[in-house]
């Protein structure tokens, strides 16, 4: 054999060490075709034959090479091993071989020692192998082959300190050479040390040097898997199969990938079939390897029934090949018990115990079967015996789990059971420490066993979702922690996903639970339990229509859903919630007749049955339905039946707590409290009972002392962080944050790494306005616990306190900490920090906002690429977050008036979340803003059909219809919304504006009356008063308007708008055109002194209002500055006007195309007699497209420009602007007044009178100047009676109005006299 043909020898050694005996045999035969007399190859062939259990053939082969000096030593050692494996041992031959071994060893060459060491290593005798290789290295003066072998021997040791030394020998063995086996050793070493880049570099060297050396590609595949790079893993697996279509490792990894990542049953089954075929053809006589390679599939097959059958069938064939192997029988028992096939499991465990009576795993499995069959006494007795054995053998997670089962089912000891479950989990995960992702990792992870533990925990968890503000049960947190690593690496496994969804549901994370269930249903649309849980989530959200839809959807996918009692139970709960108590009672009474299953674990029988916990829920729901239906006597009877039925069971306390609710509904508070007092600290539900008692003391008895006393008792009897948190929260509830702080602080000292405690302490300090202490606490706690979410809470607090630089520093430090290799949670946290940072920058570094949001979106895109592979249940939520970032970017572009970029961002948001109605609404609103009405309508129409978006869609469509001048449709849309919610003041406000703009403001009072009917408190509501104030302002009653707006001025929602309008009314009570001079010559000077005094009083009042105005938003600050300078403008004093103008110019420069600032500039220029400059600004505004938000200021700007044109005699240009005003506001009395003025100037008195009539109508006859002009034009048009009538109307309200009596009334009356 050629000395440089290291690739063939490396393959043989690799396969020998991996126990691929047939591969060894084939590779040796290939070598022997070229080197027929090579003793080393003959030895390896013999080793392969021996491994396949053809012992006599192996002995013959080994005896043939026993005389060769290179293989004599290894042949003798192998012969000894072979003889000892025989059913009948030839003692004489063994003795002869042992004496021969001593003699040969003394004179063995380095080569002989090398092969002997190899064989001992293959057989797992590490110490002996090391002894031989050390001897060989002495004899050979440091052979490189010897160093490589010594490196491998140490590398595969079970002792970590020995493994670490292996690299030294591997380095020595590969120095100045590309020894394939040595390089493989180095790559494997780096992999064990999780230096994946180093391992990949070495593996690439091997594949470059020997492209056909498959073990190197297999190693690369395993390396990519260890790095959790599934794409590269699968690609490498496919490459291996191109070279070797029956490669066992490749098919195993591809099968694992399909089971844990894709979840496609058909493909998974195909890949498992291919793995079994590869094992049966590639290694036909190797049952140990078969078992080793199929075990991971056995652990992962989950709900895939086809895969389960393939695995169980293959394991049975392995058992038939080795009928004396108790391990295979035990594994079959374990496979069946995990799939709740207890009968089959029992048979196999019995078989295992026949073969090996003291096999711990088989005994434990047998006890598990007894527990599931309800044989608790016998199981407990057996466990006592095994606990003694366990002490000598070390802890077994299965035995600890079984102890927990017995504690829960036989002795009803919740605390002991949960403590044992926790211990089982700790023992389980301790065996996985340091393991990289690999088939071995998945095998040890054993997801279905963890699901069994999780389900046991759930028996002690609340049965209903957590209410807002209530603490999450620590047990639910424990279950989430158990399942988290499973769901992370195996997101396509149904059972862990489903139980995770249950945990999220019970924790009150309803949307997260929905996302997880959605993933379950994508994997298997026929999964009954997932449909039922999804409908329960909708029920908890109050979405009864979707609850029913979900149930029917489940039926459409799987008719067996209807046979499930839970289907009818959920339906009954939905009926109860919607008030159909009679139908709910009928349904519940029907399912009460369904028999109860004995075990909680699950049902495999065909006939429907309910678990005890489900039956308890059904009875309690029936009690509730009867109570709500007024059948209290029947409710009490059913409750008593439930108490009798569940006495002494885990459901007893739950029934007791429900009985308390029934007693309370009857008003029997004392009975309720007595029942709760009967629950002792040793019983489950003790915490819930104390919480219920506390609630009664607080809300019914109004006794704060006894309320707190309940939580103090809880802390005394069940001390721990959870009880302390409840006591602290109780103090917070009664507004005693100082005492809450003491409790939180004491609990924190005992648990300095509990971030939830830090969060509460921080919130308590904020509540007591001790902001500096809160900041210090967050900063100190962050250093101790290193919890990133605390840094976000701290940054939010600093932002609230306007400490922008400090908030920026905190967030930047957190982002620097998170740099480097990131997992998904740290990336998610980084996105949160970036979004907070963008919020900070909005307040003090606007130029940085866009870049920060883009960074967040870029990072979120990377998360979305990784989530499908690692945590697929998070996809919907992460898509929503990406959409919200796009919307924030769009809003930023919108503020900058960059509409094209804004549109792109909103479309990007929709790409991330196509069905998110909020995103669709935002896009529709942008289309409306851009005047793309058809596209807006297209987006809004479907949203009208959905209840949760109907209101906003209707409001938007109403705006759209108004722009199309379809006023009736617009008003009807608002009307529909207000009929459902008359006290929706945001919509009422929009309707008042729409009625005004469509010329129907007289219809508004009817809607005010409708709102008042909802509640007697409506007239006190700030929103209602605001709407009334605006109404009175528009009908020309400024004093009434101020009275109502003042009632809304202090409100957080309506205050800013109310103050702005009040200031404008004070500065301009007659709603004149500021700067307009066309009508000034018509106004007499007789009252100029009193008019000036009135103006000054208005300015003083406006300034006083602004001194009490404290806006929190940036837009509010801008509004305040604008109003302060409008006060200066209203004085009409040149110095003040110039100061105001300077401010307006600054504002217009700061905010591109700011319409309020440009209008104010124009008004200031006119007051300063700089009309051309004013006209320039107003012409800019004339080109701006109309929007609802800017409507008022645009109308004022068009009227002011029309005034300038009127003064210059450019009536055509003025009329064009006035018609535009009327297009958007049919009630614009000023536009009609200017049109009347123009007609009057053209001596068209009839047309002038027509326009003044409309101006008089829409000013609600409140402006005497318009009345004067109308009467004058009636006089000119010889309509004397009409003129007299208008004069009387004016004089009734304004008896001293100048000139009207002499110049019009008397002349008209004189003209009527004959």
From Swiss-Prot:
SUPFAM superfamilies xrefs: TPR-like (SSF48452)
Source taxon at top rank: Eukaryota
SMART domains for this protein: TPR
Keywords: Differentiation, Repeat, Spermatogenesis, TPR repeat
Pfam family, one: ARM_TT21_C
InterPro entries: ARM_TT21_2nd, ARM_TT21_4th, ARM_TT21_5th, ARM_TT21_C, ARM_TT21_N, TPR-like_helical_dom_sf, TPR_rpt, TTC21A/TTC21B
Record's keyword annotation contains Metal-binding: no
Record carries keyword Aminoacyl-tRNA synthetase: no
Biological process annotations from GO: flagellated sperm motility; spermatid development
Xref: PROSITE patterns: TPR, TPR_REGION
Deleted gene: phenotype: Male mice display strongly reduced fertility. Spermatozoa show significantly reduced motility and morphologic abnormalities are observed, such as primarily tailless spermatozoa with an abnormal head-tail junction, as well as short and coiled flagella. Structural abnormalities of the connecting piece are observed during spermiogenesis and multiple structural defects of the flagella, with a greatly increased percentage of flagella exhibiting abnormal principal pieces and end pieces.
TPR repeats: 110-143, 214-247, 326-359, 494-527, 529-561, 565-598, 616-649, 721-754, 755-788, 790-821, 831-863, 883-916, 918-950, 951-984, 986-1018, 1022-1055, 1195-1228, 1230-1262, 1264-1297
PANTHER family: STI2 PROTEIN-RELATED, TETRATRICOPEPTIDE REPEAT PROTEIN 21A
Family note: Belongs to the TTC21 family.
Function: Intraflagellar transport (IFT)-associated protein required for spermatogenesis. Required for sperm flagellar formation and intraflagellar transport.
Assembly notes: Interacts with IFT20. Interacts with IFT52. Interacts with IFT140. Interacts with CEP78; regulating IFT20 stability and localization.
Annotated protein name in UniProt: Tetratricopeptide repeat protein 21A
């Amino acid at each position: 054999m050629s000395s440089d043909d290291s690739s063939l020898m490396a393959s043989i050694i690799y396969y020998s060490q991996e126990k691929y005996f047939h591969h060894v045999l084939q590779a040796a035969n290939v070598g022997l075709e070229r080197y027929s007399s090579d003793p080393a190859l003959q030895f390896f062939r013999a080793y392969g034959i021996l491994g396949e259990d053809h012992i006599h053939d192996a002995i013959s082969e080994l005896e043939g090479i026993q005389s060769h000096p290179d293989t004599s030593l290894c042949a003798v050692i192998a012969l000894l091993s072979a003889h000892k494996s025989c059913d009948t041992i030839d003692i004489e031959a063994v003795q002869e071989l042992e004496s021969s071994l001593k003699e040969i060893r003394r004179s063995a060459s380095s080569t002989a020692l090398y092969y002997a060491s190899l064989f001992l290593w293959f057989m797992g005798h590490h110490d002996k192998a090391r002894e031989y290789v050390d001897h060989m290295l002495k004899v050979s003066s440091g052979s490189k082959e010897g160093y490589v072998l010594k490196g491998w021997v140490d590398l595969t040791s079970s002792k970590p300190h020995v493994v670490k030394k292996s690299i030294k020998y591997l380095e020595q063995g590969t120095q100045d050479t590309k020894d394939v086996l040595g390089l493989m050793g180095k790559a494997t070493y780096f992999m064990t040390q999780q230096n994946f880049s180093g391992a990949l570099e070495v593996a690439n060297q091997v594949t470059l040097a020997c492209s056909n050396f498959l073990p190197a590609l297999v190693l690369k595949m395993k390396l990519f898997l260890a790095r959790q790079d599934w794409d590269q893993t699968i690609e490498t697996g496919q490459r291996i199969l191109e070279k070797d279509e029956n490669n066992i490792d490749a098919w195993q990894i591809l099968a694992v990938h399909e089971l844990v990542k894709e979840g496609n049953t058909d493909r998974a089954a195909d890949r498992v079939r291919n793995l079994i075929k590869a094992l049966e053809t590639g290694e036909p006589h190797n049952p140990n390897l078969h078992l080793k390679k199929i075990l991971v599939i056995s652990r992962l097959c989950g709900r895939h029934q086809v895969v389960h059958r393939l695995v169980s069938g293959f394991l049975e064939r392995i058992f038939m090949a080795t009928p004396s192997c108790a391990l295979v029988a035990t594994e079959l028992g374990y496979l069946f018990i995990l799939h709740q096939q207890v009968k089959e499991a029992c048979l196999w465990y019995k078989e295992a115990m026949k073969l090996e009576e003291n096999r711990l795993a088989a005994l434990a499995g047998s006890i598990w079967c007894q527990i599931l069959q309800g044989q608790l006494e016998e199981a407990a007795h057996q466990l006592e015996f095994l606990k003694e054995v366990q002490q000598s053998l070390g802890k077994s997670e299965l035995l600890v789990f079984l102890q927990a089962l017995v504690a829960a089912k036989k002795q009803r000891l919740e605390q002991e059971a949960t403590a044992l479950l926790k211990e089982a989990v700790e023992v389980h995960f301790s065996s996985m420490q340091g393991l990289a992702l690999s088939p071995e990792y998945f095998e040890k992870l054993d997801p279905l066993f963890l699901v069994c533990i999780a389900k046991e925990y759930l028996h002690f968890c609340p049965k209903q979702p957590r209410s807002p503000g209530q603490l999450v049960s620590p047990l639910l947190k424990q279950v989430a922690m158990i399942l988290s690593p499973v769901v992370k690496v195996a997101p396509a496994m149904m059972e862990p996903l489903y139980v995770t969804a249950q945990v999220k549901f019970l924790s009150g994370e309803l949307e997260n639970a929905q996302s997880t269930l959605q993933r379950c249903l994508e994997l298997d649309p026929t999964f009954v339990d997932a449909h039922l849980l999804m409908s329960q989530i909708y029920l908890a959200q109050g979405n009864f229509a979707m609850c029913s839809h979900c149930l029917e959807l489940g039926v459409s996918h799987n008719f067996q859903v209807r046979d499930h009692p839970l289907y009818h139970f959920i339906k009954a709960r939905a009926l109860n919630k919607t008030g159909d108590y009679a139908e709910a009672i009928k349904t519940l009474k029907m399912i009460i007749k369904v028999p109860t299953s004995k075990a909680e674990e699950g049902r495999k029988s065909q006939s429907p049955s309910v678990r005890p916990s489900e039956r308890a829920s059904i009875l309690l729901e029936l009690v509730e339905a009867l109570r709500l239906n007024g059948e209290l006597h029947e409710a009490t009877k059913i409750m008593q039946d439930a108490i009798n039925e569940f006495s002494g069971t885990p459901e007893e306390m739950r029934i007791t707590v429900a009985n308390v609710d029934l007693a309370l509904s009857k008003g029997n508070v004392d009975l309720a409290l007595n029942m709760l007092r009967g629950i002792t600290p040793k019983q489950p539900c003790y915490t819930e009972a104390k919480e219920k008692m506390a609630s009664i003391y607080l809300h019914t008895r109004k006794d704060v002392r006894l309320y707190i006393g309940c939580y103090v008792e809880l802390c005394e009897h069940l001390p721990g962080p959870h009880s302390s948190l409840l006591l602290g929260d109780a103090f917070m509830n009664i507004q005693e944050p100082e005492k809450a702080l003491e409790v939180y602080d004491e609990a924190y000292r005992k648990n300095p790494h509990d971030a939830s405690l830090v969060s509460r302490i921080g919130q308590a300090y904020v509540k007591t306005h001790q902001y500096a202490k809160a900041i210090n606490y967050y900063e100190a706690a962050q250093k101790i616990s290193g919890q990133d979410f605390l840094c976000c809470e701290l940054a939010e607090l600093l932002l609230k306190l306007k400490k922008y630089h400090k908030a920026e520093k905190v967030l930047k430090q957190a982002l620097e900490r998170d740099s480097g290799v990131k997992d998904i949670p740290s990336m998610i946290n980084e996105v949160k920090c970036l979004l907070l940072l963008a919020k900070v920058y909005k307040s003090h570094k606007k130029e940085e906002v866009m870049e920060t949001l883009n960074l967040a979106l870029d990072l979120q895109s990377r998360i979305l690429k990784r989530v499908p592979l690692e945590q697929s249940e998070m996809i919907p939520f992460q898509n929503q977050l990406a959409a919200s970032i796009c919307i924030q970017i769009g809003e930023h572009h919108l503020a900058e008036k960059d509409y094209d970029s804004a549109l792109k961002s909103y479309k990007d948001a929709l790409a991330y979340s196509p069905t998110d109605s909020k995103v669709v609404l935002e896009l529709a609103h942008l289309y409306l803003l851009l005047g793309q009405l058809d596209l807006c309508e297209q987006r809004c129409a479907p949203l009208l059909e959905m209840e949760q978006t109907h209101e906003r869609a209707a409001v938007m469509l109403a705006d759209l219809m108004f722009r199309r001048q379809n006023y009736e449709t617009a008003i009807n849309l608002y009307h529909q919304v207000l009929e459902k919610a008359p006290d929706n003041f945001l919509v009422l406000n929009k309707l008042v504006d729409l009625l005004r703009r469509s010329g129907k403001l007289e219809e508004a009072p009817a809607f005010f009356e409708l709102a008042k009917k909802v509640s007697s408190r409506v007239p006190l509501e700030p929103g209602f008063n605001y709407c009334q104030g605006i109404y009175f302002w528009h009908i020309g009653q400024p004093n009434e308007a101020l009275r109502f707006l003042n009632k809304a001025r202090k409100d957080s929602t309506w205050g800013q708008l109310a103050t702005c309008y009040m200031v404008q009314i004070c500065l301009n009570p007659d709603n004149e055109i500021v700067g307009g001079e066309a009508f000034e010559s018509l106004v007499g000077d007789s009252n100029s002194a009193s008019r000036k005094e009135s103006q000054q009083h208005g300015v003083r009042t406006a300034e006083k209002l602004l001194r009490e105005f404290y806006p929190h938003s940036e837009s509010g600050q801008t509004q305040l500055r604008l109003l302060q300078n409008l006060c200066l403008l209203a004085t009409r004093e040149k110095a003040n006007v110039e100061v105001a103008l300077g401010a307006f110019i600054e504002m217009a420069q700061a905010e591109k195309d700011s319409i309020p600032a440009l209008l104010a500039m124009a008004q200031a220029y006119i007051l300063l007699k700089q009309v051309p400059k004013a006209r320039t600004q107003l012409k800019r505004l004339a080109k701006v497209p109309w929007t609802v938000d800017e409507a008022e200021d645009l109308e004022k700007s068009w009227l002011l420009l029309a005034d300038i044109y009127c003064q210059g005699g450019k009536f055509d240009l003025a009329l064009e602007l006035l018609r535009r005003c009327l297009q958007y506001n049919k009630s614009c009395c000023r536009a009609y007044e200017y049109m009347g003025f123009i007609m009057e100037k053209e001596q068209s008195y009839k047309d002038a009178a027509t326009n003044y009539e409309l101006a008089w109508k829409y000013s609600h006859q409140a402006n005497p100047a318009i009345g004067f002009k109308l009467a004058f034009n009636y006089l000119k048009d010889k309509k004397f009676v009409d003129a007299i009538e208008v004069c009387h109307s004016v004089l009734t309200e304004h008896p001293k109005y100048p000139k009207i009596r002499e110049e019009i009334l008397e002349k008209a009356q004189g003209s009527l006299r004959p």
